[in-house]
Amino acid sequence: MEQTCDDIDEMFSNLLGEMDMLTQSLGVETVQTPSPKVTNEEFSFTVGFKDLNESLNALEDKDLDALMADLVADINEVEQRTLQAQKTSGNQQSVVTQPSTGTNNDFCSKLSPCATITGQFKNDLPPPPPAPDLDLPPPPPPPPPEPLSQEEQEARAKADKIKLALEKLKEAKIKKLVVKVHMYDNSTKSLMVDERQVTRDVLDNLFEKTHCDCSVDWCLYEVYPELQIERFFEDHENVVEVLSDWTRDSENKVLFLEKKEKYALFKNPQNFYLANKGKNESKEMNDKSKEALLEESFCGASVIVPELEGALYLKEDGKKSWKRRYFLLRASGIYYVPKGKTKTSRDLMCFIQFENMNVYYGSQHKVKYKAPTDHCFVLKHPQIQKESQYIKYLCCDDRATLHQWVTGIRIAKYGKTLYDNYKCAVKKAGLSSQWANQGTLEPAAPTGSLSAGAVQANGQIPRVVLPSSAEVAETQKKVDPAIRA
């Protein structure tokens, strides 16, 4: 009998061992929990500053007052909703029938002897000694505060506002960022940007603060010092979303400067649509022909992407060596011709698609990556902030080819939205020019915004009003003489 039990135990032990070995060989995969959404406590409220306190100190007084008004309004709205929800839940609970208390009474009766014993012990304790009666003189009154100067009073008032703003920001319903913007004259300005605003709204705010002309060439410019890449924000992009992709220790910067490349496409479309066709029209074109070309390219059933193709240098992954390949631009992405194949559609290989990708200009990549020339552009996902194998580097032979490829990618990615952005910028520039001619410094209010969530300075959501192509051409003649070039 004992031998049989020993055999059973041994068999059972062997079975457990085999099960352990089988489990280890299969490997148990752990299910990764999804990353939680960033709460207001984890959300970084500043870009370009050491901390939130420093950024609030950098705000102008009127901007700080406007921030406080917005925060108080947001929090009051949340409190009203909370009170309403509590009232509703209270009414629902009052309808529910109260449970019987018989069981509770029985339970308390069982505990009553313990309570009686505890009370008896308390009664046996001696009373505490009386407090000593000491005749101490009263403390001297505090010295009267010295009167504050006007500057000290203003500084204390601002410090109180900042302290309150720090508390309210964490309770606010709408995300707000204090952004340090580097100006064209090497100075900086601090702006409060909320999650409803697009680039066009921020540019309008900067126009009001700087009183500079509202040329269509002004832009917000994103610079990555570590990767040595840069690009301009498109006017319809949500600024807070873009900046939220930056890491907390990022050295990235936001610049406010003029870049003719931003809307060069609409001033001289022939340089992008006809340059590779060998036509004489690509050199000179009158205003009427330019307008017709833009209408044909952007206002038809679908947006026409420039027929762009040619040899480019491709940086190999993880190396500082470059290979020359033949690339073609299509609406869905960039394709290349494999070695020994033809340019027919069936032989083309997809290099990259534009969904969730941004295009950047490279800066000094000839030194950093041993590129053949300094005319480089880069394609990467917005959330990639460090060196990565998923970043694509391409190099062109000359500057004109570089601008053609970057502009062609923007057309393929954004389509007619790019043209709408330009028309809105031209309209804004025309209104600003009219105000300047009337001798007033008051900036013109925008006629419309590019997104339904965009907000004007007065807190109202503007109606989208885009000018016709004829109005754009007429306004552009007055504002930008370069259109005749």
From Swiss-Prot:
It is found in: Cell membrane; Cytoplasm, Cytoskeleton. Residues 125-147 have a biased composition (Pro residues). Its main location: membrane. One of its GO terms (cellular component) is cytoskeleton. Pfam families: PH, RA_2. Residues 175-262 form the Ras-associating domain. SUPFAM superfamilies: PH domain-like, Ubiquitin-like. This is Amyloid beta A4 precursor protein-binding family B member 1-interacting protein. The gene is APBB1IP.
